Amino acid sequence: MNLLKALSIVSGMTLLSRILGFVRDLVIARIFGSGMQTDAFFVALTVPNLLRRLFAEGAFSQAFVPILGEYKTKSEVKNDLSETKILVDRTATLLAWALILVTLIGVIATPLVVFLTAPGFLSAENGSQKYELTVNLMKITFPYIFFISLVAMAGGILNTWKKFAIPAVTPTLLNISFISMSLLAAPYFDEPIYALAWAVFIGGVLQLALQIPALLKISMLPSINFNFFNPMNLYKLLKIAVQDEGVKRILWLMFPALLGVSVSQISLILNNIFASYLQNGSVSWLYFADRLMEFPAGLLGAALGTILLPSLSEYNAKGWKEKYSELLDWGLKLTFLLATPAALGLAILALPLISTLFFTGEFSQHSVYQTRLALWAYASGLPALILIKVLAPGFYAKQNIKTPVKIAILTLCITQILNVILVLLLNFQHMGLALSISLAAWINAGFLFFKLNQHKVYFNYSVAEWIKFLLKLLTALALMSASLFLLVGSDESWLQITQIQRAIKLFGVIIVGILVYFATLFVLGFRLKDFKRHV
């Protein structure tokens, strides 16, 4: 398989999802604006998303995909995938019942969860109303963890089989659910914000349903026992699953992985706690800025991580050390080639982007400026966040979870120290929260890179070749930045025209920036064929 082609497929599907995501955010901003209700909803969504990352896309995926890849490689040698299917069935059964338990506890304990994650809501203006609204919304959004965690497991299976398209397109269903519920259902709710909560629930159901045909096609649809009426039989099945050698290895890897992912998610929760004490709208400004930053991060970072982990796991199972290192080198160069212009573009075009997408309806000019501050801070850390997506799989594929965990713990401590300095001492407000994440991301990426070198995982690269590569890259970035600065003009020139005019103008500026960047790279000797890689 051509990895560049696979990256294009995943990025293309992700692009579709991101476009729908921006339409979703545009609709939410126009209908709901930024204020008490949106703050309540975004906090209500934070905890289910956090648990999703812990159980599925975080600790579980890091432990499950490398083991699954190893089983698949060995089974293919025997030409018998029965052992792999048993591993999938037993793992899915344990995951499903763990999710049921967590969901039930979460719904019951929602008042306490909201108090712990956003304590400032009680002391804010209209505090009691804001707190109660958040509690009610979270009771609806919490079951999303059950659906999306099983979706993430299905995605891990499909990606291991190099079936990247379905997992990549799956997020579009949640965005479609958001858009549909906002436009069609919100007017029929006494409090329209409840439409967004139900959109989360419905989206999770649709996403899970989409995985089933694809899993059936590769004969890997998990067989899960949901028989509540035969507890003894269920107990026996769960006991067998826990005693399975492959499942035990997954669980053993999950403990350090869970700690590592918990650290990063705790950092987000602590940021929410800081933000809950800031002025109304702070959580929303950070959210909208994060959505813009996540656009290139998803297109490149998530896509690279998706295609690298299964291939690296396969190389590790086969003992191909040099190919392993070469694949990491390929991922790092692509990251610098695509992430650095994206970061500069976000920073230079911050106000044009925000005003074009969100400056309408209840989203005020003040919100535009405040969101820009957050986006500037996030953009500075974008390359580092994507580098982490490339470097971390270098450890996960080798089933080494402890090293990234130690780095994550150190990063958490640094992030909170930066929060105190930037938010409390320097009074950077919500911008300080975003900046602390960016600075910590660079520190995280630096430590991961150092450890990969130290462990001789990433070793056969040319320093001279990298210096030459970076000098050419800096030249292209300088010319692109100059062209963007010349074309952007003043803030007023964007705020005083219609949204359609802003969109047309922004499209033209982006096209010119892209052409200048890639034309410069072409003149300097970069060719697409140089980045093609087969696995």
Question: Model regions: which residues?
Answer:
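Membrane-embedded alpha-helical bundles of multi-pass transporters/translocases
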Residues: 1-535
